[in-house]
């Protein structure tokens, strides 16, 4: 039996320390796909790695053996030794749960910021690498193509990516509206907490190439900068950094403003009054409101963003529900396709036998018609192909319709006996494909995950 399994960790399950390992591993460009030939139980493999997520999507015959091998692969990728556990930070989905999860990831329903577009491009890159390494075959090829079409449906039929639902996202969207493209803008992030992290995620998604992080604790600034390909500057050098900055986004926990009117005014002279935009999303505020009075300085605070956020949150929730409905329907369609794989060996055998008979009879007939022109020979061959195709159409459609029913085996057996398909083979039927339906709540949250057996790598000693 063939199982579809997804094993991974993301921003919801892994602490900052583990996610930092993800960022380091991602930059090393070490591709685990090259190790597939060493995995005895894994048939197909796709590998997705971002700053906030690492996932292995694979098919295998032996579920526990496959999980054990891919867990070891995850350890290797993260550079963990045998004493460092990952079990508490890893999730695993199988069957249609895995399919549904991939659909949700591609549709950005499982992202740190619901609706962000970056993850789909990352998943496409992962699939492109897998095809180059030839680690995907029939099942994962079909699944990934379906995944991309599902994500496209979600984008086109919902407004999931249209409305900002976090202060950080709204701040970046505001900057985008002000400047248009952010690719050539220099951004100074003050603070390295969760809001700064989210802002960095959005800025990166918008193509920002010049980002500087400042934080009272330099180590935190360095950690954030590593994960988002940014630079750092000491906290007491913030004023100096203003000289070459277009956008300042501040989100510290300081009890009083860290940027004062007189300080900013002095730096504006050095900038020759080049426009400078401040987005203050801290509470209490990081930036003296009075700086808005300085020429060519534009200040926006959290109150300017919050009203938009409140309106958009309900709209995004409704759009997410619509997206989940699309995903549920597409998951069922994929389940139906998977079920047809159970009858594929019989269908293939039926077509091959019909083709063998067609060619044999055609050759025998044409041998008695030596004076027939090449054009007429081709016409007769096309005729026989069309007849065979039409004769097989109804029984093949019938088998596919019965593929996901409990009586499937009976109909497969009848077909094999009726057309004498077992004649001359070894009597063994091709491996079946195990399909399991996902359990999910109305809000799209996971209700069940992989339950380990006694020999599973997840069980603690």
Curated annotation (Swiss-Prot):
Q: Under which EC number(s) is this enzyme classified?
A: 1.2.1.70
- Relay the domain remarks: Possesses an unusual extended V-shaped dimeric structure with each monomer consisting of three distinct domains arranged along a curved 'spinal' alpha-helix. The N-terminal catalytic domain specifically recognizes the glutamate moiety of the substrate. The second domain is the NADPH-binding domain, and the third C-terminal domain is responsible for dimerization.
Per the record, the pathway is:
Porphyrin-containing compound metabolism; protoporphyrin-IX biosynthesis; 5-aminolevulinate from L-glutamyl-tRNA(Glu): step 1/2
Biological process (GO), any one:
protoporphyrinogen IX biosynthetic process from glutamate
UniProt binding sites for substrate? 50-53, 111, 116-118, 122
Give disulfide pairs as residue numbers. none
The entry lists its GO molecular-function terms as: glutamyl-tRNA reductase activity; NADP binding
Which positions are catalytic residues? 51
Key words of the record = NADP, Oxidoreductase, Porphyrin biosynthesis
Class of enzymatic activity (EC top level): oxidoreductase
The annotated site for Important for activity falls at 101
Q: Which species expresses this protein natively?
A: Syntrophobacter fumaroxidans (strain DSM 10017 / MPOB)
Q: Does the keyword Transit peptide apply?
A: no
| Residue numbers binding NADP(+) | 191-196
Misc. comment = During catalysis, the active site Cys acts as a nucleophile attacking the alpha-carbonyl group of tRNA-bound glutamate with the formation of a thioester intermediate between enzyme and glutamate, and the concomitant release of tRNA(Glu). The thioester intermediate is finally reduced by direct hydride transfer from NADPH, to form the product GSA.
Function noted in UniProt: Catalyzes the NADPH-dependent reduction of glutamyl-tRNA(Glu) to glutamate 1-semialdehyde (GSA).
Give the reaction(s) catalysed: (S)-4-amino-5-oxopentanoate + tRNA(Glu) + NADP(+) = L-glutamyl-tRNA(Glu) + NADPH + H(+)
Q: What PANTHER family would the database entry show?
A: GLUTAMYL-TRNA REDUCTASE
Q: Which PROSITE patterns match?
A: GLUTR (PS00747)
Subunit info? Homodimer.
The similarity comment for this entry is: Belongs to the glutamyl-tRNA reductase family.
Q: What is this protein called?
A: Glutamyl-tRNA reductase
């Amino acid at each position: 039996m063939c199982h579809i399994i997804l094993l991974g960790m993301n921003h919801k399950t892994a602490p900052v320390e583990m996610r930092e390992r993800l960022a380091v591993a991602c930059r090393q460009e070490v591709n685990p796909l090259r190790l597939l030939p060493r995995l005895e139980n894994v048939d197909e493999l796709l590998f997705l790695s971002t700053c906030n997520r690492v996932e292995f999507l694979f098919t295998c015959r032996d579920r526990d053996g496959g999980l054990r091998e891919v867990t070891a692969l995850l350890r290797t990728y993260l550079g963990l030794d045998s004493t460092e556990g990952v079990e508490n930070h890893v999730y695993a989905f199988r069957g249609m749960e895995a399919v549904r999860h991939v659909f949700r990831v591609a549709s950005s329903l499982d992202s740190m910021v619901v609706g962000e577009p970056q993850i789909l491009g990352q998943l496409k890159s992962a699939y492109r690498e897998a095809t180059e390494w030839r680690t995907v075959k029939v099942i994962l090829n079909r699944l990934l193509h379906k995944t991309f079409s599902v994500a496209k449906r979600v984008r086109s039929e919902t407004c999931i990516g249209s409305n900002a639902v976090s202060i950080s996202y709204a701040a970046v969207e505001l900057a985008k509206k002000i400047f248009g493209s952010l690719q050539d803008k220099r951004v100074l992030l003050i603070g390295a907490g969760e809001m700064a992290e989210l802002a960095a995620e959005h800025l990166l998604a918008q193509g920002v190439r010049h980002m500087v992080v400042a934080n009272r604790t330099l180590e935190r600034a360095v950690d954030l900068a590593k994960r988002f390909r940014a630079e750092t500057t000491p906290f007491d050098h913030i004023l100096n950094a203003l000289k070459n900055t277009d956008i300042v986004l501040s989100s510290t926990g300081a009890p009083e403003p860290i940027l004062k009117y007189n300080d900013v005014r002095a730096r504006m002279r050095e900038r020759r009054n080049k426009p400078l935009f401040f987005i203050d999303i801290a509470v209490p505020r990081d930036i003296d409101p009075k700086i808005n009075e300085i020429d060519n300085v534009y200040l926006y605070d959290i109150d300017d963003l919050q009203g938009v956020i409140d309106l958009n949150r309900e709209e995004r929730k409704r759009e997410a529900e619509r997206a989940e409905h699309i995903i549920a329907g597409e998951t069922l369609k994929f389940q139906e396709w998977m079920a047809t794989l159970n009858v594929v060996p019989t269908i293939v055998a039926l077509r091959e036998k019909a083709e063998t008979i067609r060619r044999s009879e055609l050759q025998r007939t044409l041998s008695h018609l030596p004076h027939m022109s090449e054009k007429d020979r081709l016409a007769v061959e096309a005729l026989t192909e069309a007849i065979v195709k039409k004769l097989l159409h109804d029984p093949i459609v019938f088998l596919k319709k019965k593929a996901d029913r409990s009586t499937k085996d009976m109909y497969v057996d009848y077909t094999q006996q009726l057309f004498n398909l077992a004649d001359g083979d070894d009597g063994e039927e091709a491996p079946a494909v195990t399909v399991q339906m996902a359990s999910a709540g109305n809000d799209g949250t996971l209700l069940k995950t992989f339950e380990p057996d006694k020999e599973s790598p997840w069980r603690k000693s």
